Structures are given as C-alpha cells and as structure tokens.
C-alpha cells in the first residue's frame, strides 16, 4: 500500500519531469490505441482479446465514475488530468469491443448463431465490469498507479498466445507494439522515479521487464508474420 498524498506531493515537487514523462507516455498510449483500431479495420480482425478489452473498458470507466473523488476529495490536477485523458481511451476500448463483435464470430464461435455470439459479447462485457469492480474493491490502489501498469501487461500477455494460435499478425503491426513498449516504459519510469520505494521493488521491475519483453516479441512477430486474410464480417464482402 502506498501513500497517495505522498505521491501527489512528489508530483508537485517534480512537476517538469512528471509532465515530460506523462506527456510522452500518453502520446504513445494514444498511438498504441489508435494504431490498433486502424490495424483491426485494415485486416478485418479484432486486435485484442475480448477478455483484455472488457477489463480495460471496465478499468477506465470505473476511474471516470469516480469524478467526485478526483475533483472533490483529492482535487489534484494530476488526477483530474488523468480523468480527462481516460475519456477518449474509454471510447476507444468500446470500439475494440465493437471490433470483436464485428470481426470475431468466425474466429471465436464459428458454429454458433449470430444471436448466440451477440449474447456472448454482451455477457463478456458485463462479466468484465462485474469482475473489475469486485477486484477493485479489494485492491489497495486508491489512485490507480498499480493497475495502470498491470492493465498494459494484460494486453501483451493475451496478445502473444492469440498470435501464436492464429500464426498470423492480423490486427497487429510493428508501429503499434513499438508504441506499447514506449508507453509502458514511460509509465514504469515515472513510477520508479517519482512515486517512492513501493514502485522500486523487484516485482514491479519484473512486471516492467515482462511488458517490454512481450512488446519486443510482438514487434518481431508482427514484422515476420503477415496479416493473413480473415473471413469478412457478416454482410460485408471479402476483399
């Protein structure tokens, strides 16, 4: 457990460094997210596992719903700025879920009806929301420092097995995963430099290493493997 007020005091004491690292991190975050949408539409394949999409969406929505906490209880510019930054990411994560629905039936439930697949996607979203809010109630992470790092790790550890199973790079690209590496490095660097000894532990650094190593693997795989043509979504012609 960390002291959130000590972290916010450190942010204020090192505001130039924090803004520099934070700006770079968020730029790569948006680069990673937007590139993934482009890749998914290009290849007609959802870029992220539904499990990851639903938890990301639930994570960011939960932060947005805590408006009074950030603007009332804490009333600190960093937490308020993060709130604003998560509005577009939440919208993008909703697009990811839509891409799973639009492109994913033939991969995930090829023998099922469209109605059954619709129910599956909706149930996954509800399960993600329920699961996240349940877990969050037990986490000692009041200002979402730990979970921002972990949710990134979730993206790469669910992407690797899916890529190996498909044996193609549909929905992926070198640029996308380079953005991921720099995004995660920016966040973990910020926490290690400014957020105190809780974020200077071997376990935290191991999580950072796992993100970077996984990102490097995805860069190499995206370069080597070509996006194989996938079945068109229902009602759309294959090109």
Go through each PLM region and give its residues.
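Alpha-helical membrane-protein topology signature
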Residues: 1-239
């Amino acid at each position: 457990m960390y002291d959130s007020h000590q972290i916010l005091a450190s942010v204020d004491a090192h505001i130039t460094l924090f803004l520099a690292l934070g700006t770079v991190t968020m730029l790569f975050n948006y680069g990673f997210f937007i590139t993934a949408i482009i890749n998914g539409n290009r290849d007609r394949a959802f870029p992220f596992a539904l499990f990851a999409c639903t938890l990301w969406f639930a994570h960011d929505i939960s932060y947005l719903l805590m408006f009074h906490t950030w603007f009332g209880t804490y009333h600190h510019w960093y937490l308020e700025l993060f709130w604003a930054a998560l509005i577009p990411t939440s919208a993008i994560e909703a697009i990811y879920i839509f891409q799973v629905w639009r492109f994913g039936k033939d991969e995930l439930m090829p023998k099922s009806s469209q109605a059954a697949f619709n129910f599956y996607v909706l149930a996954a979203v509800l399960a993600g929301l329920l699961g996240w809010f349940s877990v969050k109630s037990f986490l000692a992470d009041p200002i979402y420092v730990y979970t921002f790092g972990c949710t990134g790790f979730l993206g790469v550890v669910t992407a690797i097995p899916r890529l190996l199973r498909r044996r193609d790079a549909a929905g992926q690209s070198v640029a996308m995963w380079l953005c991921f590496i720099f995004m995660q490095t920016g966040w973990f660097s910020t926490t290690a430099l400014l957020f105190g000894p809780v974020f200077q532990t071997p376990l935290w650094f191991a999580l950072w290493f796992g993100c970077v190593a996984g990102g490097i693997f995805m860069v190499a795989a995206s370069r080597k493997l070509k996006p194989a043509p996938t079945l068109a979504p229902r009602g759309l012609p294959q090109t």
